Structure formats: structure tokens, C-alpha cells
Amino acid sequence: MEDLETRCASLRTEIAAAEAQLTKLKRELHEAEGAALRAQSQKTASANATTGQRTKSKWPLHGEEYRRYGRQMIVPQFGLQGQLKLRDAKVLIVGAGGLGCPAALYLAGAGVGTIGLVDGDTVEASNLHRQVLHRSRNVGKLKVDSAIEYLRELNPHPTYIAHQAHLTPREAPDIFKDYDLILDCTDNPATRYLISDTAVLLGKPLVSASALRTEGQLMVLNNPPQPPGDKTGGPCYRCVFPKPPPANSVTSCADGGILGPVVGTMGVLQASEAIKVLTSAGESVEATPPSLLIFSAYSSPQFRTIKLRSRRPNCAVCSAEATVTLESVRSGSMDYVFFCGTVDPADILSPEERISPSEYGNVDSAGAQRHIIDVREKVQFDICSLENSINIPMSTILASAYSAPTLDADEPKRLPSWLPPEVAHESNKPIYVVCRQGNDSQTVVRKLKELGLDHGGERPVVDIKGGFRSWREQVDPDWPDY
């Protein structure tokens, strides 16, 4: 029996080695074919430059290109002319994450001639479930480098340009000017306004998308890309959202979560819209009114479309009364961070109202009587929780209407519906509050004190600093890092 198991293990090892070698050979073949194609093009160009003559090819594409792109070229709405337009196109993708990865993947596969990627982040393990260009071995590598490595293996023909930094107002105009179309694949309002403003001022159409949890949105903006003041141009991001959302209402994927197929769907739709814009260049787009596409994975139907108005007559960027200029963008006088606002980490409690995770770990080890309240949402509480902790989600606390509890023994007890009676009445037990990162828990500590649960300071109501992120660092290294 042991001999058979050993033989099976040996065969699996040999098969894995053979598959790895085959993959390596296929990659080398693709690279060699791409190099040969580029060398032939350079040789022809050099010969033409030397003789002063232009050699006319029988066909507008190389043979390998017909084989690679043939299935999309026989689509009636696309055809040979569509392929030629893609080959000559230059697309800039801002953000090499959940949206940018699938968008870049399909645009590279379709044969877009030049693809630029802008991102200053590095690959993290938490990216891999949705950012499909990055692989486990590239954790820690710059995202643009990781993405281009994958794209070159997929299709060596396009030119790939890496912009290895976050987009800034000073650099944005100089980067954008060399491209025909911009894709906004970012996840924060300040960058979205910067991208839209720069695209409008440089006359570039923009495909913008977003995704969070199980929902996504998509818009094609500044299409057609007419100068500011021209009412026939497509609306910009400011036309749709003249004012940014309150900074404290903006939820990131890290905080709100995201399903990989949801953001993947939106990225693929961005690529589809980009191809439509690029292949219709020079043609009228009046027949396609601006709209907002909304995707909801758990709804039926999953897709809805909302018609958008044309350019706002008082838009700060694309109207005749525009106040935002390329110079104001470059110089920084248009402060996007100030315009959108920022949320600083919560620091609303005094040092006496907070303890470190390691200090609470000592309390836990000593077996002291206490209440530990976990204010994460239930879905997070179900992933991991401390023994004997009570889950009271922050959203439940904020959404509930209540009157302050009466703790006087001579009056009937009136408690908030979300507060367990034992927490209110077991005044001999201190209350410890914890959350994911140490911000929500501070708010809840303040709320519990407003309700009088600290009995005028006689009963400790304490926040655990840094939440479970710090708990993992200081107490339990095996705590799930999600």
C-alpha cells in the first residue's frame, strides 16, 4: 500500500513538473512570436526609411493578428475597421485594482495599441480575490508592474506604460495628454473629481465605474468631448455630482466589503464601453444619451439604467462659466482633498477611557468579571469573536431611537431596545468596547456614558485601543486578518 502511495505521489510530482515546463514553453513561444512580429515591423520601417518608399502590404494586419483577433473582427458592429482603430488607440487606466484589472485584461486581449496604468500601491494578499491580474507570488510588488507582467503574457503586441505613482494634480495633465481615452478605476471621491476635471480640460472621453459590496455603477462621461461651454458635449462627473458626499459617509472596500464578481462585472463593462467609444471615434454619438448604469447582484432585475441630463449650465468645469482650469489643477489652487473633505482617525476619548489590547488581555487572563461589547456588524462578528463577547452592531446603535435609561431604583427601567438588561444593571462589572479598528468603539463608549451606564464615573466604560487590528498585533497573532 505504501509503495502505491509513493508511486502516486511521484507521478503527481512528475505531472506538475511537466505542466510547469509546458507553461514555460508556451510563454516563451508567445514572447518569441511577439518579438518576431515587432522585429519584422522595425525591419520594414527601417527599409522604408532607407529607400524613401512605403512598401504596401496586401493586408492591413499581420497574419498573427488575424488569428488572434478574428473572432471579434467578424462581429458586425466591430469589423476590420474596429480592430484598426483599437490598434491605433491609447488608453489610460487609473487604478490597477478590482476595476482596473479586468478592464485592462480585456482591453489588452482586444488589441488596444497602447495601455497606460497609473497606481502607486503594492499587491496585498487581500487584493487577490478580486484583482485578477495579480498573483500570489507578486504580493509586495507594485501593482502596475504586476499587472503589466500578466498582460504581456496574455498579449505581447500592445505597448504597456507603467506610471508607478498615485495620480496627483500636478502630474495628471501631463500624463493624460498622451492618451485618447481615460478609465477611472479608482475608489475615492477626490481622485474621481481630479480625473474628470483633467479629462474635460484636455478633451478626453472618460469611462467611470465604482463598486461596493454587491452593487456597482458605470457612466461614460465627457462623450463627445467638446470644449467647456459647448452644450453638445457629454456631461462630466461634476455635472452628475456637483457636491461630493460627506467625507464620513464614504465607505471603502476595506470597510464595507466587496464581492469579486461584482467589481469584475463593472471592470468588464468599462472595457466594453471603452471599445465602443474607441471604435466610434469620429462618428456621431448623439444617438446615445448619457446614462448611469446600476448593477445589483442580489436584485432582480440586476441592471437598471437612469437617464442623465446633459451638461449643467453652471458646471465649474465644462460650462461657459467654468472656473476650474488646467493651471488651477496643476498649481494646486484647486484643492481636491479640501473640496471632498477628509475623515481623521477618531480620537474622542481621554487616555483614561482607553486601554491597550495587551492590557485587556491581562484582564481576560485574570478572569475578572466584565462585559465585553463587540460593535462590529454581525457578518464580521460571525467570522471571529472573543469568548463571551456581546455583539451590538454600531449600525443598530446609531439607527435606534431611544430615551435614556432610568437607573434610579424607584423608577421603571426604560432601556434602549439594543441594550441587554444585564449590561445596564450589573453595575459591578466594567464594560469594555471593541471594534475592528478602534474608531467605532470610541463612539459607542461615549454613547454608553451619555446613557448613564458609567454611574457618574463609578463604573468603568472603556475602549480597547486599535480594535482587533491591534489585538492581532499585541495579543493573538492567529486572529483572522480579514
From Swiss-Prot:
HAMAP family: MOCS3_Uba4. This is Adenylyltransferase and sulfurtransferase uba4. GO terms for molecular function: ATP binding; metal ion binding; molybdopterin-synthase adenylyltransferase activity; molybdopterin-synthase sulfurtransferase activity; nucleotidyltransferase activity; thiosulfate-cyanide sulfurtransferase activity; URM1 activating enzyme activity. Zn(2+) binds at residues 236, 239, 315, 318. Its cofactor is Zn(2+). ATP binds at residues 98, 119, 126-130, 143, 187-188. Residues 366-480 form the Rhodanese domain. SMART domains: RHOD. The keyword ATP-binding applies. Binds 1 zinc ion per subunit. InterPro entries: MOCS3/Uba4 (IPR028885), Rhodanese-like_dom (IPR001763), Rhodanese-like_dom_sf (IPR036873), ThiF/MoeB/HesA (IPR045886), ThiF_NAD_FAD-bd (IPR000594), Ubiquitin-activating_enz (IPR035985). Keywords: ATP-binding, Cytoplasm, Metal-binding, Molybdenum cofactor biosynthesis, Multifunctional enzyme, Nucleotide-binding, Nucleotidyltransferase, Transferase, tRNA processing, Ubl conjugation pathway, Zinc. Pathway: tRNA modification; 5-methoxycarbonylmethyl-2-thiouridine-tRNA biosynthesis; Cofactor biosynthesis; molybdopterin biosynthesis. The gene is uba4. PANTHER family: ADENYLYLTRANSFERASE AND SULFURTRANSFERASE MOCS3 (PTHR10953:SF102), UBIQUITIN-ACTIVATING ENZYME E1 (PTHR10953). In the N-terminal section; belongs to the HesA/MoeB/ThiF family. UBA4 subfamily. It comes from the Eukaryota. Residues 39-54 have a biased composition (Polar residues). The keyword Metal-binding applies. GO terms for cellular component: cytoplasm; cytosol. One of its GO terms (biological process) is Mo-molybdopterin cofactor biosynthetic process. The active site is at residues 253, 435. Its EC number is 2.7.7.80, 2.8.1.11. It is found in: Cytoplasm, Cytosol.
